[in-house]
Amino acid sequence: MVDDDPSIVAVVSDILIAEGHEVDSAENGAEALMKANGEALVLLDMRMPVLDGWGFAREFRASGKRSPIVVMTAAENARRWAEEIGAEGYLAKPFEIDALIAAVERYATGTH
């Protein structure tokens, strides 16, 4: 999970851990690239310092990594941004817990 908002990271992590998932987090795209190592799924905020979601996605894909990316953003154009970076899905903040769990189940298990 890549998000610069610690409260979002805490809430999403708690939900996913309760559902039996492992969660690793990074505060920005640059940190996430350094940590990237065979993730089942990347939950990605688009507006972050240092390296934003667009930069992360470009470098992540250029490195040959193919983990699904789900954009998580409060911006009205979340769907368009997801399409622009080649993400498999998107969640518009604020999102419902059920939508988060469904997206993780769908994309992390390869049933998309």
Task: For each feature predicted by the language model, list its residue ranges.
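Acidic catalytic/metal-coordinating carboxylates
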Residues: 27-28, 51-55
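Acidic, metal-coordinating helix/loop segments flanking the phosphotransfer/catalytic sites
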Residues: 25-41
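Receiver (REC) domain active-site loop signature in two-component systems and cognate sites
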Residues: 48
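C-terminal output helix
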Residues: 95-105
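Alpha4 helix (beta4-alpha4-beta5 surface) of REC/receiver domains from two-component response regulators
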Residues: 55, 76-91, 102
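Charged docking surfaces used in two-component/phosphorelay signaling
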Residues: 10-14, 18
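Active-site residues of response regulator receiver
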Residues: 45
